[in-house]
Amino acid sequence: MRILEITSDLDGGGVDRLLYDYCSRMTNDIQFDFVVTSKSEGILEKPLKELGCKIYRISQIREGLQKHNNQLKKILTDNHYDIIHDHSGYKAWCNLRVAKKCGVTARIAHSHQAFMAETTKQKIMRILSTPITKIYSTELFACGNDAAKWMWGEKAFNNGKVYIMKNAIQAERFNFSPEKRERIRCEYNIANKFVIGNVARFSYQKNHEFLINIFAQVKKIRTDAVLMLIGRGELEDTVKAQVETLGLRDSVIFMGVRNDVPDLVNAMDVFALPSRFEGLPVTLVEIQANGLPAVISENVTKEMTISKDFTFIPLTQSTLAWAKAISETQRNESRNLIKNTIYDLNIATNELRTKYLTIVQRKGK
C-alpha cells in the first residue's frame, strides 16, 4: 500500500511529530511519502527519509494555483498512490480535486482544529470551502470529536461519517524520570526553580503574548519562577521583544525546536497552554504520560483529559487569575496516565493501519 501525506511542513510541530510516530511504526507494510509546501527543510525530513519515505516539495497555492496543481499532478502521475491524506482541513479540496483527476480513488480530508478564531473573511471561506472539500474527499478524518463537529458538521459526526484518528504518542517515552529531571535542571541552572513549561509553535493560535503577560504576574508571586518555551515560529521574535520589554530575559528560556521533549518535560513543574483555539493538542497527551499538571485555556477540548491535575481557565480571566492558578499548582502525579489507553501509539497504530486497509479494500471493489 502506498500513501501520500500532504502537510505544510515537517518541522517538528504536533501534527508533524504525530505523522512521524505513526509512519515509523508502519513502514514495514506501507510506503509513506510526503508533500510539503515549506521552502525550508524540516527537522523530521531526514528521519523520514531514513525510513524510506520520499519528501516532495511543491509551491504554495498563493504562489500560483496552476503552478501548485501542476507540481502535485506530476507527483501523482509519476507514482501510484492508493490513498492521498491531506491535513489542511477545509482547504484540502484543491489537492483532493487534483488527486481525483489523477485517479486516486481514496482521498482523505483531515481536520486538526476546533473552534478556530476567524475573521469574517476566513469564516466565509471555511463555510464555502467545506462542502467542496466533502465533494472531493472520500473519507473525513479528525483529531477529536470537537474538531470533527466544527469542521465537518454535527450531522456527519453523529452519522459516523468521520473517523477519529487519535493524537497518540509513544507513551513509554514520557515516563517520569527523577534522574532526567535532576540532570536537565542542573544543565540549565534551574535546580531550585519553579519551572513553567510550554511546547508550542510561536503563532497567533498558541497565544504566547498572553502567556508572557501571565508569567510577568507569576514572577510577582514566585520570584523563583522560570518559563521554558519549546518551539519556534513566525512570532518568536515578537515574543522575545516582549520578554525584553518586561525585563524577563533572565527568567525565560527559549529552547527552539527539540527532539528531546520527552526528557525536557521531566524538568517542568507545571505546563501552561493559553491557546486561542485547538483541536486535540498532542502536547497535552504527552504531559499526561509524564504526570505533569497543567493550566489550560477553556478553548482547548477536554475530551482527552484523564489527569485530575488539569485546570481549565477562560481566556477572559485576568492574567493575575491565571498566574495564581499556575503558582498554586504542584507536581503530585508521576505515573503514566496514557499507557494502554486509546492514546497509546501501540494501540492506535494498529487501529489506523486497519482503517487504511479497509479504505483501500473498499475502494478497490
Predicted feature descriptions by range:
Residues G14, R331-K365:
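A charged, aromatic-enriched C-terminal amphipathic alpha-helix characteristic of glycosyltransferases
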Residues V257, R276:
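Aromatic "clamp/platform" in nucleotide-sugar-dependent glycosyltransferases that forms part
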Residues E63, K67, K149-G153, G160-K161, ...:
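Acidic anion/phosphate-binding donor-loop and adjacent secondary structure
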Residues G13-D21, F194, N198-Q217, E234-K240:
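A conserved mid-protein helix/loop that constitutes part of the nucleotide-sugar donor-binding site
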Residues D86-A92, S111:
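Short His-centered aromatic/hydrophobic patch
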Residues V35-V36, P293-S297, K302:
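Short hydrophobic beta-strand element within catalytic cores of glycosyltransferases
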Residues E5-K67, K161, E234-E236, K355, ...:
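N-terminal strand-loop element at the rim of the active site
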